[in-house]
């Protein structure tokens, strides 16, 4: 098993509903360690930069508007197969299709406001982590 790092966002809808603690509990219960975390209110430019790969997609404008609608929590998770583990914890993108007990089934209202984001691969995790955190902000958990 490989120890990996992945990137996670608790989106504005879940932050507004005070689900941060419950979501962090799910990460930790699943064996993922939070090694960096902060609350950010994205500017339009920050959101457009983060989601640049989707800039030509029809939902891009609505995505940027949603992601700038309120504060978000960004965090770096570390653990065995962290990318896959976090994706399993999150559940399907559409909460109507997400398995019971997943974050999206429990905390999301729609495919557009689906509570959380998680990296889909180690390479994207590295890029997404670097977008929000400097190397000095990452605190490996040795105990």
From Swiss-Prot:
UniProt name for this protein: Nucleoside diphosphate kinase
Active site: 117
Keywords, comma-separated and alphabetical: ATP-binding, Cytoplasm, Kinase, Magnesium, Metal-binding, Nucleotide metabolism, Nucleotide-binding, Phosphoprotein, Transferase
Enzyme's top EC category: transferase
Naturally occurring in which organism (per UniProt): Shewanella loihica (strain ATCC BAA-1088 / PV-4)
Catalytic function, reaction form: a 2'-deoxyribonucleoside 5'-diphosphate + ATP = a 2'-deoxyribonucleoside 5'-triphosphate + ADP; a ribonucleoside 5'-diphosphate + ATP = a ribonucleoside 5'-triphosphate + ADP
Residues engaged in binding ATP: 11, 59, 87, 93, 104, 114
Domain of life, source organism: Bacteria
Subunit relationships: Homotetramer.
Function of the molecule: Major role in the synthesis of nucleoside triphosphates other than ATP. The ATP gamma phosphate is transferred to the NDP beta phosphate via a ping-pong mechanism, using a phosphorylated active-site intermediate.
GO BP annotations, alphabetical order: CTP biosynthetic process; GTP biosynthetic process; UTP biosynthetic process
Example of a GO MF term: metal ion binding
Cofactor: Mg(2+)
PANTHER family in UniProt: NUCLEOSIDE DIPHOSPHATE KINASE (PTHR46161), NUCLEOSIDE DIPHOSPHATE KINASE DDB_G0292928-RELATED (PTHR46161:SF3)
Subcellular compartments: Cytoplasm
One term under GO cellular component: cytoplasm
Keyword Cell membrane: no
Family the entry assigns: Belongs to the NDK family.
Entry-linked InterPro entries: NDK-like_dom, NDK-like_dom_sf, Nucleoside_diP_kinase, Nucleoside_diP_kinase_AS
EC number per UniProt: 2.7.4.6
Keyword Metal-binding found: yes
């Amino acid at each position: 098993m490989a120890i990996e790092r992945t990137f996670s966002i608790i989106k504005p809808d879940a932050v507004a509903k005070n689900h941060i603690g419950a979501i962090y509990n799910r990460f930790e219960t699943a064996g993922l360690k939070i090694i960096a975390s902060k609350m950010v209110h994205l500017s339009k430019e920050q959101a457009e930069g983060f989601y640049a790969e989707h800039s030509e997609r029809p939902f891009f404008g609505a995505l940027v508007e949603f992601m700038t609608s309120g504060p978000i929590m960004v965090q770096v998770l570390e653990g065995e197969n962290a990318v896959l583990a976090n994706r399993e914890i999150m559940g399907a993108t559409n909460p109507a299709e997400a398995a019971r007990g997943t974050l999206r089934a429990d905390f999301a209202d729609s495919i557009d406001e689906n509570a959380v984001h998680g990296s889909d691969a180690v390479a994207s995790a590295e890029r997404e982590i670097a977008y929000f955190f400097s190397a000095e902000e990452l605190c490996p958990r040795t105990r």
